[in-house]
Amino acid sequence: MTRLIFMGTPQFSATVLQGLLENPAYDILAVVTQPDRAVGRKKDITMTPVKKLALAHQLPVFQPEKLSGSQELADIMALGADGIVTAAFGQFLPTVLLDSVTFAVNVHASLLPKYRGGAPIHYAIINGDKEAGVTIMEMVKEMDAGDMISSASLPILDTDNVGTMFDKLAILGRDLLLKTLPDYLSGDLKPVPQDHSQATFSPNLSAEEERLDWSKPAREVFNHIRGMNPWPVAHTLLDGQRFKIYEAELAEGSGSAGQIIAKTKKALVVAAGEGALSLTLVQPAGKPKMPIVDFLNGIGRSLEVGDVLGE
């Protein structure tokens, strides 16, 4: 039985951890995850999905604010694990920790060397990629730069957003890890170096990148909305206030960028730089998210054709 330390934070990571827990070949000695954080409007202190799963299985949990130089690091190394598996952990691993185990592998949600960094799924959708994937790679000090052990891909559909792709890629990553690890640990599967000259990066999105640019073609705006849903959520301005857009559909029509070019009781169509979008799920400032029908029957009733979003 291979003794593991697992490191991860969001639901993507929890799906991978669940697969390891269900496999008798692996003994999870402890789990390392990010500290509990304040979440939502009420700022409720919330455990990470990985912590919830670990506690349900009575596993020791470490939550260092920063792993390097911490007492938690010393405690983790004292466990004497054979290896480390990480998946969307959110911190760099100190070299001393990597050197203390026989192997350390990461489940990364991109087809490396493309989209190294913390937001690969967001960028894949925003950039209009036709596919996304996962890579099982060896951990090194440089971010997501280790040798690749295996990879797998699946298509990105127009109906997909960050949430749906996270769920799909978590399952793909879990299954690929469980398929890959035995051959990797036996030496039958040899890692392949990345072509570092082809590396691209997907840093965490800035607040400025959440704002929609209506001057872009409708397809690009459509991809941007999907690439921000369900977090951090794309927005524009309506009467000077933030107006979040969760979902939209490509539509016919033309007009000035951000201009409302059609309005009915059930639809609101906005022009982009080329083409248009019909908004379907929105969130006005200070309100919950709602279908466009509810918005148009309420505070959106005063909107008129010719009004402009983004101003």
Swiss-Prot record:
EC numbers for this chain: 2.1.2.9
Binding-site residues for (6S)-5,6,7,8-tetrahydrofolate, renumbered to this chain: 110-113
CDD domains: FMT_core_Met-tRNA-FMT_N (cd08646), Met_tRNA_FMT_C (cd08704)
GO CC entries: cytosol
Keyword Cytoplasm: no
Keyword terms, alphabetized: Protein biosynthesis, Transferase
GO function terms (MF aspect): methionyl-tRNA formyltransferase activity
Catalysed conversion reaction: L-methionyl-tRNA(fMet) + (6R)-10-formyltetrahydrofolate = N-formyl-L-methionyl-tRNA(fMet) + (6S)-5,6,7,8-tetrahydrofolate + H(+)
Group of enzyme by EC: transferase
Function: Attaches a formyl group to the free amino group of methionyl-tRNA(fMet). The formyl group appears to play a dual role in the initiator identity of N-formylmethionyl-tRNA by promoting its recognition by IF2 and preventing the misappropriation of this tRNA by the elongation apparatus.
Similarity-based family: Belongs to the Fmt family.
This protein's name: Methionyl-tRNA formyltransferase
Organism: Streptococcus equi subsp. zooepidemicus (strain H70)
Name of the encoding gene: fmt
